[in-house]
UniProtKB/Swiss-Prot annotation:
This is Protein A2-A3. The keyword Protease does not apply. Interacts with A1 protein; the two proteins form heterooligomers. Involved, together with A1 protein, in the second step transfer (SST) which allows the completion of viral DNA into the host cell. GO terms for molecular function: DNA binding. Belongs to the T5likevirus A2 protein family. It comes from Escherichia phage Bf23 (Enterobacteria phage BF23). The lineage of its organism: Viruses, Duplodnaviria, Heunggongvirae, Uroviricota, Caudoviricetes. The gene is A2-A3. The keyword Amino-acid biosynthesis does not apply.
Length: 138
């Protein structure tokens, strides 16, 4: 089978015209919908309108044009709590050692295979849930 080259699609390149269009659109999006929208879905709209290959290039172009505004609030990466199973097991083991129930924290290491919700219920039952939060830095 012969390899047939088709006509290449025109490559996108930033120029003064599309840069100015992007800056104007960005400022309108901020005024109409707020900074959070402008820095997420707004960047996609701008990329589509000016013909940019990817929305990723838009913030860097807006930055070099001194128009990009960083969001005030930090983006949350990941989800859920910062409390880990290990925090529960450490606190529960510490209390068990202090009470003389076990000699070593390794005796309760298998608790880490339990669900986080189950460990939370046990911590609440033992009255150490707040201590677990402190251990996790919350």
């Amino acid at each position: 089978m012969a390899n047939v080259k088709t006509e290449k699609s025109a490559k996108f390149a930033w120029n003064e015209e599309n840069t100015q269009q992007a800056v104007t659109m960005y400022q309108q999006l901020i005024n109409e919908n707020g900074l959070e929208f402008a820095n997420s879905d707004g960047l996609k709209e701008i990329a589509k309108t000016v013909g940019a290959a990817s929305p990723v290039s838009v913030p860097s172009k807006l930055t070099s044009a001194k128009a990009y505004q960083k969001s005030d609030k930090p983006r949350k990466v990941g989800g859920g709590s910062s409390i880990r199973k290990a925090h529960y097991v450490r606190v529960i083991a510490k209390h068990a050692i202090d009470s003389g129930i076990i000699k070593d924290a390794d005796d309760l290491a298998s608790l880490e295979s339990a669900k986080l919700e189950t460990l939370d219920a046990v911590a609440q039952l033992l009255g150490v849930a707040d201590e677990v939060k402190q251990a996790a830095g919350e």
